[in-house]
Regions:
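Short, aromatic/basic amphipathic alpha-helical patches
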Residues: 233-234, 254-266
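Register-specific detector for alpha-helical tandem repeat solenoids, activating on a conserved position
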Residues: 100-101, 128-129, 154-155, 180-181, ...
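N-terminal targeting peptides
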Residues: 4-47, 51-54
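Structural signature of tandem-repeat unit edges
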Residues: 33, 37-71, 82-97, 108-125, ...
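Acidic, Ser/Thr
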Residues: 104
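Small-residue (G/S/T/A) turn/hinge positions that recur once per unit in extracellular repeat modules
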Residues: 50, 77, 97-98, 235
Length: 275
């Protein structure tokens, strides 16, 4: 059973004792947590019958562990003013149908680490902009993510400028229709393995890898893909270092289509490996 508790580790306040953390509830109201100099650890019991919609932190928080019922506002960031490590433990997300923009940057784009194994995603149908502009995160562990109900992954990782590794090998994408801009502007990624992706229902891959300027190797093995240029416009735009695309097990129509797309996106010297 979810305990509705938030634990905080706080660094040096540098003499500023007028600091508070606010937990806002979906049903209305909030819990205000005073943060005092010298007190480094906090364990706050939240209201048992309410769902968190927003967590407004302070820059001095080094770690937050959330074990609570969550129902964030669709299309709005769940957490603000936070630049430490965020961990979810046994959270109740049963009232959520989407996680659109849940960790989107903006006020808290300096967040450095996310631990998501306690975040249940089995009922989620949309993850568009979920990690958009998480600019300081270098790695995201998604090994626990259940994506079998997801239909929308538009801009899911867009503008994750510092992201160096991304393992999506466990993603079930058989229901996904929109991958527009999914990895756009992930400028530190050097390789990406999407060989497990089922793209049979996808109707939009526009700008999917746009400005992945350091991407060198892309694995699309097993893809069955036949979108028009309009629906895959600028899919590889700005991938200036892309040299190798693995397409093992792909039919010739898919191979020809991918070649046409990257040629239209003004890429040169890309090698297709089929065996």
């Amino acid at each position: 059973m979810t305990k509705n508790i938030i634990k905080l580790n706080v660094g040096d306040l540098k003499g500023n004792t007028n600091k508070t953390v606010e937990v806002k509830y979906y049903e209305g109201g909030s819990t205000i947590i005073p943060i005092s100099e010298g007190n480094k650890c906090y364990s706050i019991q939240l209201e048992e019958d309410k769902y968190i919609k927003e967590f407004v932190g302070i820059e001095e928080i080094t770690e937050a562990i959330i074990s609570a019922k969550i129902k964030s506002n669709d299309g709005y960031s769940f957490i603000h003013n936070f630049q430490g490590s965020l961990k979810f433990a046994d959270c109740d997300t049963s009232k959520m149908g989407s996680m659109n923009s849940m960790f989107e940057g903006g006020w808290y784009r300096c967040i450095k680490k996310l631990k998501l194994d306690g975040l249940n995603t089995e009922n989620i149908s949309s993850m568009s902009f979920m990690f958009h502009q998480c600019k300081n995160i270098k790695n995201i562990d998604l090994s626990n993510f259940d994506t079998h109900n997801v239909t929308n992954m538009c801009d899911m990782f867009a503008e994750c400028d510092s992201l160096q590794k991304l393992d999506v090998s466990n993603f079930d994408t058989h229901n996904v229709t929109n991958m527009c801009g999914m990895f756009s502007h992930c400028k530190k990624l050097e390789s990406l393995d999407l060989s497990n992706f089922d793209v049979s229902k996808v109707t939009d891959t526009r700008m999917m890898f746009n400005d992945c300027s350091n991407l060198r190797i892309l694995d699309l093995s097993g893809w069955d893909f036949n979108l028009s240029y309009h629906d895959s416009w600028w899919m590889f735009g700005g991938c200036s270092r892309l040299k190798t695309i693995y397409m093992r097990g792909c039919n010739q129509k898919t191979i020809d289509r991918i070649k046409e797309i990257y040629n239209n996106d003004t890429l040169n010297d890309v090698k297709i490996i089929t065996k």
